[in-house]
Curated annotation (Swiss-Prot):
Function of the molecule: Capsid-specific restriction factor that prevents infection from non-host-adapted retroviruses. Blocks viral replication early in the life cycle, after viral entry but before reverse transcription. In addition to acting as a capsid-specific restriction factor, also acts as a pattern recognition receptor that activates innate immune signaling in response to the retroviral capsid lattice.
Chain residues that bind Zn(2+): 95, 98, 117, 123
Biological process per Gene Ontology, one example term: autophagy
Leading EC class: transferase
Modified residues (Phosphoserine): 86
Record note on quaternary structure: Can form homodimers and homotrimers. In addition to lower-order dimerization, also exhibits a higher-order multimerization and both low- and high-order multimerizations are essential for its restriction activity. Interacts with BTBD1 and BTBD2. Interacts with PSMC4, PSMC5, PSMD7 and HSPA8/HSC70. Interacts (via B30.2/SPRY domain) with HSPA1A/B. Interacts with PSMC2, MAP3K7/TAK1, TAB2 and TAB3. Interacts with SQSTM1. Interacts with TRIM6 and TRIM34. Interacts with ULK1 (phosphorylated form), GABARAP, GABARAPL1, GABARAPL2, MAP1LC3A, MAP1LC3C and BECN1.
Residues of the B30.2/SPRY domain: 281-493
This protein's name: Tripartite motif-containing protein 5
Enzyme Commission identifier(s): 2.3.2.27
Subcellular location field: Cytoplasm; Nucleus
Xref: InterPro entries: B30.2/SPRY, B30.2/SPRY_sf, Butyrophylin_SPRY, ConA-like_dom_sf, SPRY_dom, TRIM/RBCC, Znf-RING_euk, Znf_B-box
C-alpha cells in the first residue's frame, strides 16, 4: 500500500519533459511544474519556432515574468529522495503482493515479478528470466537505440538548419530581386519624366518663339491700321472743307492713297508643326535591357602611368587631364603659349590588360569640349603617321575609339578609305544629347566594342564590329587640349 502511494507521489513530482524528479521546480499559471533547466530550454525553442511560450503539457501560453518557484513541490521531492535512500525506501524493489524481491522478468507481460508471482496462475507457462540478464541485454539494445536516435536527432537538426538556411537564402534573393525591380522601374520612370520634361520645354520654347513673332506682327498691324485710319481722317477732312482745302496738296494725298499696301501678318500653319509622338517605349525598354545586361560586366578600371604619356593623373588613378601649355620666349622677350601634341601625348592606357571575356566601364566627360576614348591594343604610335591629323586613330593601328571636338562634334574613327589609306575615315555621329558620361562595352570573343550614351538613357552611340584583337587590349583615354579632367567611374557610382 505504501509503495503504491510512493509511486503516485513520484508521478506528481516528476518533470513531464525529462521524466526525472523535479530539480529546482518552477510552476506556471496553468498549475504544471517543470525543472528550471527543462523549462528554460523549452522557452527558448518555443520563442525561436513560434514567437511565444506555451506550456509543454496543456499548450496554454504564459509570460516568462509569471513563472514562480514551487518550494512546496521542491520539499516533497527532497523528502521522496530521502525515502528512496533509506532502508524503508528499498522496499519499493519488493513485490507489492507477496513482499518478495523482484528478481524475475516475465517476457510475455513485460513485467518484473517475484518467484511467487512466477508460480501463480497469472504467469504460469510464461518465459521468465533473471532481471540481471534481461537488464544487461536490454541495456545493450536500449544503448544502441539511443545512439541511433541521437544520430537521427543530429540528422534532423542538420536538416532543420539546412531548411532555415535555404529559407534565409530565398528571402535574401527575393529581396535582392525586389530591389533590382524597384531600381529598374525607378530608372524607367526617370527616363519618362525626362522625356516629358524635355517635350514640355520644347513646347514652351515653341510657344515663346511663336508668340514673340506674333506680338511683333501684331504691333506692325496696329501701326498699319493707325496709318490707314489717319489717311482716311485726312481725306474726310478735305471732302468736308472748302475747295481750297480740297485742292491743297491733293496730288500728294492721292499718291499716298495709291501707295497704301496692306502687309499681311506672318502666319504659322498648325499643320506644319512638329507633331508630338510618345516615346518608343518598346525601343527604350530594349535599350534599357541592353544597358542593364552589359552593366553586369562592369569592371573597376584605373589608369596605368607611363613615361610615354604627358597626361596629368590624379592620386586615385581615376582622373586624367591635359598638362598646362608650355611658355616659350621668342625674340625680344615675346611670350608664346605652345601646346604639345595633344593628339597622342595626352593619351593613356588603363591598367587592365584584357585578353578574353566581356568587360564594361564608364567614363565621365562632363564639361569637356574635347576627348577621345575607347580601346587600344598598344601604345606605340606609328612614327610615319601624321599625328596632327589623327592618322594613328584607326582600327588597323589598334585603336577603336570615338571622340568629341568643339563641344558638339561627336565622331568615330574608322580605317581610311582605299584612296586615302593613311587618313582615318571620320564617321560623324548623330547624338541628340551630347554625352556627359559614356559607357564602353568590350566583348573580346565577339570582337566588338560598343559605346553607350549614359546621359541619354544608355542609347547606343556607335559600335565597332569584326575587331581584330590579335593581342591584349586596354581601356584608352585622351583628354586632348581641354584641361577639364576625364574620370573613370567606379562600379558603385
Amino acid at each position: 500500500m505504501a509503495s503504491g502511494i510512493l509511486v503516485n507521489v513520484k508521478e506528481e513530482v516528476t518533470c513531464p519533459i525529462c521524466l526525472e524528479l523535479l530539480t529546482q521546480p518552477l510552476s506556471l499559471d496553468c498549475g504544471h511544474s517543470f525543472c528550471q533547466a527543462c523549462l528554460t530550454a523549452n522557452h527558448e525553442k518555443s520563442m525561436l519556432d513560434k514567437g511565444e511560450s506555451s506550456c509543454p503539457v496543456c499548450r496554454i501560453s504564459y509570460q516568462p515574468e509569471n513563472i514562480r518557484p514551487n518550494r512546496h513541490v521542491a520539499n516533497i521531492v527532497e523528502k521522496l529522495r530521502e525515502v528512496k535512500l533509506s532502508p524503508e525506501g528499498q522496499k519499493v524493489d519488493h513485490c507489492a503482493r507477496h513482499g518478495e524481491k523482484l528478481l524475475l522478468f516475465c517476457q510475455e507481460d513485460g513485467k518484473v515479478i517475484c518467484w511467487l508471482c512466477e508460480r501463480s496462475q497469472e504467469h504460469r507457462g510464461h518465459h521468465t528470466f533473471l532481471t540481471e540478464e534481461v537488464a544487461q541485454e536490454c541495456q545493450v539494445k536500449l544503448q544502441a537505440a539511443l545512439e541511433m536516435l541521437r544520430q537521427k536527432q543530429q540528422e534532423a537538426e542538420e536538416l532543420e538548419a539546412d531548411i532555415r538556411e535555404e529559407k534565409a537564402s530565398w528571402k535574401t534573393q527575393i529581396q535582392y530581386d525586389k530591389t533590382n525591380v524597384l531600381a529598374d522601374f525607378e530608372q524607367l520612370r526617370d527616363i519618362l519624366d525626362w522625356e516629358e520634361s524635355n517635350e514640355l520645354q520644347n513646347l514652351e520654347k515653341e510657344e515663346e518663339d511663336i508668340l514673340k513673332r506674333l506680338t511683333k506682327s501684331e504691333t506692325e498691324m496696329v501701326q498699319q491700321t493707325q496709318s490707314v485710319r489717319e489717311l482716311i481722317s485726312d481725306l474726310e477732312h478735305r471732302l468736308q472743307g472748302s475747295v481750297m482745302e480740297l485742292l491743297q496738296g491733293v496730288d500728294g494725298v492721292i499718291k499716298r492713297m495709291e501707295n497704301v499696301t496692306l502687309k499681311k501678318p506672318e502666319t504659322f500653319p498648325k499643320n506644319r508643326r512638329r507633331v508630338f509622338r510618345a516615346p518608343d517605349l518598346k525601343g527604350m525598354l530594349e535599350v534599357f535591357r541592353e544597358l542593364t545586361d552589359v552593366r553586369r560586366y562592369w569592371v573597376d578600371v584605373t589608369v596605368a602611368p607611363n613615361n610615354i604619356s604627358c597626361a596629368v593623373i590624379s592620386e586615385d588613378m581615376r582622373q586624367v587631364s591635359s598638362p598646362k601649355p608650355q611658355i616659350i620666349y621668342g625674340a625680344q622677350g615675346t611670350r608664346y603659349q605652345t601646346f604639345m601634341n595633344f593628339n597622342y601625348c595626352t593619351g593613356i592606357l588603363g591598367s587592365q590588360s584584357i585578353t578574353s571575356g566581356k568587360h564594361y566601364w564608364e567614363v565621365d566627360v562632363s564639361k569637356k569640349s574635347a576627348w577621345i576614348l575607347g580601346v587600344c591594343a598598344g601604345f606605340q604610335p606609328d612614327a610615319t603617321c601624321n599625328i596632327e591629323k589623327n592618322e594613328n586613330y584607326q582600327p588597323k593601328y589598334g585603336y577603336w575609339v570615338i571622340g568629341l571636338e568643339e563641344g558638339v562634334k561627336c565622331s568615330a574613327f574608322q580605317d581610311g578609305s582605299f584612296h586615302t589609306p593613311s587618313a582615318p575615315f571620320i564617321v560623324p555621329l548623330s547624338v541628340i544629347i551630347c554625352p556627359d558620361r559614356v559607357g564602353v562595352f568590350l566583348d573580346y570573343e565577339a570582337c566588338t566594342v560598343s559605346f553607350f550614351n549614359i546621359t541619354n538613357h544608355g542609347f547606343l552611340i556607335y559600335k565597332f564590329s569584326h575587331c581584330s584583337f590579335s593581342q591584349p587590349v586596354f581601356p584608352y583615354l585622351n583628354p586632348r587640349k581641354c584641361r577639364v579632367p576625364m574620370t573613370l567611374c567606379s562600379p558603385s557610382s
